[in-house]
Amino acid sequence: MSDDFRTRAALERVAATHGLDAAQAGALSAFVELLLGWRRANVTGLTDPVAVVDKLIGDSLALLSVPQLRERGTGAWLDLGAGAGIPGIPLAVAVPAATVTLLDAVARKCAFLEAAVTASGLTGRARVVCARSERYSSSGAPGRDAHAVVLARAVSELPVLVELAAPLLAEGGVLLASKTRRALEEEGDAAAAAAERCGLAPEPPVLLFASPLDEAVCAVFRKTAPTADWLPRREGMAAKRPLGA
């Protein structure tokens, strides 16, 4: 069985699972082809097309089951540390009413993201910002208090994500961070402490799917207070001196 046939079958299965139409499936196919071909950006270590569909596209679209994402489906979303465009680009394809900012500080990854936006037919609905989150969310910056949803996957530990997301979110907005159940148990208390200082409140995590080794969950934090004047801290401080430590 050829790779093309296997990839097409995997995409059709994922698209059907999440109610996507043929045009959306085609956009995801173009994105997968770009992911596999764009070696210089080092955006993914996966080389098997079916693994890319299942682990990157499928895992991204699993977030569609999160109620807090559905309630914010027409707002401005931001993918924090977007890297390979996961989960931001698949979700932008799946939810046409959302506008998505793909934020990353690494130039070669930003170049990939620009190409991915074009290949996926998202010009005008998704844009790339090449900057650190602290700079993009600083006082007077366009990203401050501007987003209904901040998405994060495999970027940093949860207390760090909470602090970085806080000044990016509008009041009432939500941070949705994909984690394993084990990581959430290890990082949850520190993340809750960081959230309290940053004006966010944890909500019950949402199970995305189970694997033989662990469960994938979405950690949810809602912004309940205005952004504090001291946020964001200096670049790198969230990771160097986590608030919940």
Walk through the language-model features, giving the residues of each.
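Acidic active-site catalytic centers that drive phospho-/nucleotidyl reactions
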Residues: D59, D79, D104
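Conserved class I S-adenosyl-L-methionine
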Residues: R72-G83
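Short secondary-structure boundary/capping elements
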Residues: K55, G83, S156-E157
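S-adenosylmethionine
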Residues: A98-T101, A105-A245
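Conserved SAM-binding loop of SAM-dependent methyltransferases across substrates and taxa
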Residues: A84-A97
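A general structural signal for well-ordered alpha-helical segments in protein cores
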Residues: R8, L28, S60, G88, ...
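Class I SAM-dependent transferase core
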Residues: S2-T74, R108-K109, A115-G121
